[in-house]
């Protein structure tokens, strides 16, 4: 289900793509919406911030669809397992799919919000930013829900991808739009 963002065999995105790229785009919008995000020139030759948001939206919608299918399949399979293997599946593979699904959905909504804001449709942009924020919070909640036993507190310092930071930034972006 990994999303290909470029032509090379190793150009496949993990959970960082739907967090880092939308954060870069949102930050650029708040900094100077007339300029594209120069830190994305390695990935796209889009000339404007809006084109970059459209590029990201297209990829992230595809990622959302892929992980939605994987999520449905994995959840269906988990129902046929005894309790111990089911818990292991939910703590590992299913959790990772949930994180990816929520992050890609959040990223697609973030890009939709940016496109609307760049078009001057601020009420819709605000609404979609709020939905995006909720998706990133859902990804964090999924991680925290799988902490138990020796894994208690394991995701409290999830700081590599930092989905909580993505949600926090979207909260500030919503304030900016307001």
Positions of PLM-derived features:
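Substrate-binding groove of N-acetylhexosamine-processing glycoside hydrolases
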Residues: 1-178
